[in-house]
């Protein structure tokens, strides 16, 4: 499976980013996202002919999911007239920032259906953009705001991929927020 994921990444990183980004939250719902983590860890150990880490894109492609969920919860909190729903949003937003999307998924976006699929679309586009820009992760890190350090190559110490990840995250929050207000 790991070899298949590498082949897909080499064939079309944009398609790989789109698919992983879009389906990550659906995989989370069934607990199947954990099946991709060992593949990502294995891919992180691959080196090029010069002995430099080549990085991997599975965890890169899922970066937008937490921020899309966070933005959607912000939008729902602002737009909703339902007091109970408004009370559910702040804890889900805090969890989303920290990379835990289950409260947002199960408590807010999935029951409303459309916001869930909008966040999948935003995350898929974010994954495609990150992979198109050549952003890769090189080590394990937390999720959400704690994930940015995984984009710094231990070989080159280049922080540009991390900055791209931060910008894409902010855009995900804004786009998902606006989509809920429209």
Please describe what each predicted stretch is.
Residues 8-19, 30, 49-58, 81, ...:
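Membrane-interfacial loop-to-helix junctions in multi-pass transporters
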Residues 4, 9, 91, 103-182:
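Transmembrane alpha-helical segments and their short flanking loops
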Residues 21-33, 49, 95-98, 130-131:
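Transmembrane alpha-helix interface/packing and boundary motifs in multi-pass membrane proteins
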Residues 35-39, 68-80, 170-182:
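Transmembrane alpha-helical segments in integral membrane proteins
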Residues 29-36, 81, 135-139, 181:
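Transmembrane helix-loop junctions in multipass membrane proteins, especially transporters and channels
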Residues 22-26, 73-77, 104, 128, ...:
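Alpha-helical transmembrane segments of multipass membrane proteins
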Residues 41-125:
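Helix-loop-helix junctions within the multi-pass membrane cores of secondary transporters/permeases
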Residues 3-4, 8-11, 15, 19-26, ...:
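Hydrophobic alpha-helical segments of integral membrane proteins
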């Amino acid at each position: 499976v790991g070899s298949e994921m590498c082949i897909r990444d080499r064939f079309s990183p944009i398609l790989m980013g789109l698919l992983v980004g879009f389906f990550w939250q659906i995989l989370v719902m069934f607990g199947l996202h954990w099946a991709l983590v060992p593949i990502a860890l294995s891919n992180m150990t691959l080196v090029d002919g010069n002995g430099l880490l080549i990085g991997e894109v599975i965890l890169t492609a899922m970066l937008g999911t937490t921020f899309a969920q966070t933005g959607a919860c912000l939008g729902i909190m602002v737009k909703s007239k339902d007091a109970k729903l408004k009370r559910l949003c702040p804890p889900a937003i805090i969890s989303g920032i920290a990379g835990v999307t289950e409260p947002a998924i199960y408590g807010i976006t999935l029951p409303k259906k459309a916001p869930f699929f909008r966040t999948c679309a935003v995350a898929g586009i974010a994954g495609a953009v990150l992979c198109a820009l050549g952003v890769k992760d090189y080590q394990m890190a937390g999720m959400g705001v704690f994930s940015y350090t995984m984009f710094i190559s231990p070989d080159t110490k280049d922080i540009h991929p991390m900055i791209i990840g931060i910008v894409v995250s902010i855009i995900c929050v804004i786009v998902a927020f606006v989509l809920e207000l429209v």
